[in-house]
């Protein structure tokens, strides 16, 4: 009887700790800048029991859905697009693609089927404010699928989740570089 009472709680503790293994990851945040350099929101990625909790708040955008993506480079300066023209936040580079899929896809595709950086759209209200919260197991804060040392970009238009390279989601409206906050 004593062994059963001892083993069962220890087994439950071990299972709960293994489910929280990713909770050792740092929390990272990006201040979202507009094209003038003004901070207009934040994107925070933090550990959650299923992987990563994503929380985004932004203001000053037109009403409606906006494409949202993790980009390769930790740089929000102007830079060249695929055609070599300088665009706002172009130095952020292309979409983060840890699975080397070379394919724009929806936010629920596996990393080997679509860019790991393709996120759900953020919807902005008539007041110009948007908020998005979700959990994902496709991205972490560090490691091969980590966002630390990368950027996040909010685009001008909705993402069609199929057109390469950016889902036909228009220009880059907001950008932020992820930094560890703990």
Curated annotation (Swiss-Prot):
Tree of life domain: Bacteria
S-diacylglycerol cysteine lipid modification positions: 20
* Residues in the signal sequence: 1-19
Q: Which residues bind Zn(2+)?
A: 95, 104, 115, 118
Give the UniProt entry's GO cellular component terms.
plasma membrane
Q: Main localization of the protein?
A: membrane
Q: N-palmitoyl cysteine lipidation sites on this chain?
A: 20
Give any GO molecular function from the UniProt entry: copper ion binding
List cystine links: 76-175
Name the InterPro entries for this protein: SOD-like_Cu/Zn_dom_sf, SOD_Cu/Zn_/chaperone, SOD_Cu_Zn_dom
Cofactor binding remark? Binds 1 copper ion per subunit. Binds 1 zinc ion per subunit.
The region called Disordered is annotated at: 91-118
Membrane topology, from the record? Lipid-anchor
Where found?
Answer: Cell membrane
Q: What is its EC number?
A: 1.15.1.1
Q: Which cofactor does this sequence's record say it needs? A: Cu cation; Zn(2+)
Entry keyword set: Antioxidant, Cell membrane, Copper, Disulfide bond, Lipoprotein, Membrane, Metal-binding, Oxidoreductase, Palmitate, Signal, Zinc
A single Pfam family it belongs to is: Sod_Cu
- List the PROSITE patterns hit by this protein, alphabetically: PROKAR_LIPOPROTEIN
Gene3D superfamilies xrefs: Superoxide dismutase, copper/zinc binding domain (2.60.40.200)
The record ties this protein, via PANTHER family, to: SUPEROXIDE DISMUTASE CU-ZN -RELATED
Spell out the family assignment given in the record's similarity comment: Belongs to the Cu-Zn superoxide dismutase family.
Name it: Superoxide dismutase [Cu-Zn]
Source organism per entry reads: Deinococcus radiodurans (strain ATCC 13939 / DSM 20539 / JCM 16871 / CCUG 27074 / LMG 4051 / NBRC 15346 / NCIMB 9279 / VKM B-1422 / R1)
Gene that produces this protein? sodC
């Amino acid at each position: 009887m004593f062994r059963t009472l001892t083993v069962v709680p220890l087994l439950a503790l071990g299972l709960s700790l293994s489910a929280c293994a990713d909770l050792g990851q740092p929390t990272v945040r990006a201040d979202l800048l507009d094209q003038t350099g003004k901070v207009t929101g934040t994107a925070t990625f933090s550990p959650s029991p299923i992987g990563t909790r994503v929380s985004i708040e932004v203001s000053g955008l037109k009403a409606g859905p906006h494409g949202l993506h993790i980009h390769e480079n930790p740089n929000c300066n102007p830079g060249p697009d695929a055609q070599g023209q300088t665009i706002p936040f172009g130095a952020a580079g292309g979409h983060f693609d840890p699975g080397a899929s070379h394919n724009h896809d929806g936010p629920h595709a596996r990393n080997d089927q679509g860019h790991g950086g393709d996120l759900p759209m953020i919807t902005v209200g008539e007041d110009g404010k948007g908020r998005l919260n979700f959990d994902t197991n496709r991205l972490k804060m560090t490691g091969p699928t980590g966002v630390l040392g990368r950027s996040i970009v909010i685009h001008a238009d909705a993402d069609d989740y199929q057109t390469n390279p950016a889902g036909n989601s228009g220009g880059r409206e907001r950008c932020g570089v992820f930094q560890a906050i703990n």
